[in-house]
From Swiss-Prot:
It catalyses: Endonucleolytic cleavage to 5'-phosphomonoester. The lineage of its organism: Bacteria, Pseudomonadati, Pseudomonadota, Gammaproteobacteria, Pasteurellales. Its EC number is 3.1.26.4. Mg(2+) 1 binds at D10, E48, D70. SUPFAM superfamilies: Ribonuclease H-like (SSF53098). One of its GO terms (biological process) is DNA replication, removal of RNA primer. Endonuclease that specifically degrades the RNA of RNA-DNA hybrids. Pfam families: RNase_H (PF00075). Gene3D superfamilies: Ribonuclease H-like superfamily/Ribonuclease H. This is Ribonuclease HI.
Amino acid sequence: MQKQIEIFTDGSCLGNPGPGGIGVLLRYKQHEKQISAGYFLTTNNRMELRAVIEALNTLKEPCSVTLHSDSQYMKNGITKWIFNWKKNNWKASTGKPVKNQDLWIQLDQAIQRHHINWQWVKGHSGHIENEICDQLAKAGAENPTLQDVGYQPE
């Protein structure tokens, strides 16, 4: 039987683009782990994606995951849009290249070994775990130490 893991994620950007951060809260039974990281120059959507990638890559074995995020972009992208993007050689319905393709590929790889129940939560609505992740993401954005490799300014 796979471990039942609850994951909460958030991304933040001070300016868009600007310094950004990720916030992650992983919960297994009574154990919790928090992750915060900051990037010098990025976008809010890249931080939302990176938060989920970082969370899933932290898991050492296949798990049954309930993943909570306030990002409709991330949730719709991984549960709806990615199938056509892959079929269309990473082109959006407009014919233009999919933005953040590098991270979508990483996220697609990260989900393969897990069973994931995707849950959208309304941001800034008093959801305790989402608020914790928001604080972690903002702290990362305020103290960036990493390059967002793959970020392509427009």
